[in-house]
Amino acid sequence: MMLKKNLVALFLSISVLVVGHLAGVPALAAQLACGPVTNKSDALPRSIAIGTNPAGTGAHALGSGLAAVASKKTALTGKVQPYNGPNAWMTLLENGELEFGIINILDAKMAATGTGNYKKAHPSIRVAQGGVFPFTVGLVVRDESNIKQVSDLKGKRMAWDFGGHAISQTWQSAMMEIGGVKGSDVEQVRFSNLNEGVRAVAEGKVDASIVALGIGLVEEVNAMKPIRFLNLPNTEAANKLLGQYGAMIVKAVPTTGVKAETHVVGYPLQLVSSAKVSEKTVYTMVKTWWENLAELQTFHPLFKRWKKEHQALTNFTVPYHPGAIKFYKEVGAWTAKHDTRTKEICS
């Protein structure tokens, strides 16, 4: 019951996502220019491409499942296109070269407004599905390490930067901050992507890195050298700080790297599209994935948290695509609250 209340609190906290700043990320409260869909075609494309993080990550696992169901259940061919992270594929989505992408709720807002990790605004980004909730991330160390809590990271080597997946650094800095550790307290070892940084933990090149729970990359690294997630402080102060980012502390479910009761960070991981993708295309795909959720859930455990009640969020940070709205209205998932929220975030 307490976990359910906490998850409800996280949904509510998304509406205050944009207050304040953390780790050098500016406030994100500006309204968006929510223009109409520019692709008016009534014809479906022959294929759709989904931008994801590299193989072994949660985003890639989700994109692979969505692409497979698209290919099986429609006349379209679904393709997964992995990149170092959303920073690497966002321009392709903006230009209409990708139809969809997997991105977390904070990253989507930053991309739309050109703030935080983005030097340029990408105003055409639109939500298609609310996706996974909660998606969980934590700080991982070698199990044999004497690092037992976040404060023990002072003076240690941390994987850093992550190139095209810059949002990982934002989340990592947040987890360090709630444990009383600043970037200047650690030795920063830069990597071009998240996978390299996490593998470096097992290889002994760094002492800790951010990584998501329950993904293939964790299994791979744990096979190289047993790893362990650090327990994050489950305090009011920690949740207040994370609430600025639409996230909160949640209890980790039993999985590789969770050795005891462990608290990690949870937030929504969404499927987005753009105004360059036609209403018919987004409507068709959202309908297909909604109606074939049971099959999606056979592809990866993360789809167990890809629930219908999470697909039409009421506290979204970038607008929903008209094609998605059309479908959610048909199934009764879109309400007056959604219309009110759209007016709140759109100029």
Give residue ranges: language-model regions.
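Pocket-lining segment of extracytoplasmic ligand-binding domains
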Residues: 105-107, 113-119, 123, 141-145, ...
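Hydrophobic/proline-rich hinge and linker segments of small-molecule sensing/allosteric domains
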Residues: 33, 126-148, 273
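An extracytoplasmic/periplasmic, membrane-proximal ligand-sensing/linker region
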Residues: 45-46, 195, 203, 213-225, ...
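Immediate post-signal peptide segment of exported/extracytoplasmic ligand-binding proteins
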Residues: 29-50, 146-157, 322, 329-330, ...
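C-terminal segment of classical bacterial N-terminal signal peptides
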Residues: 16-27
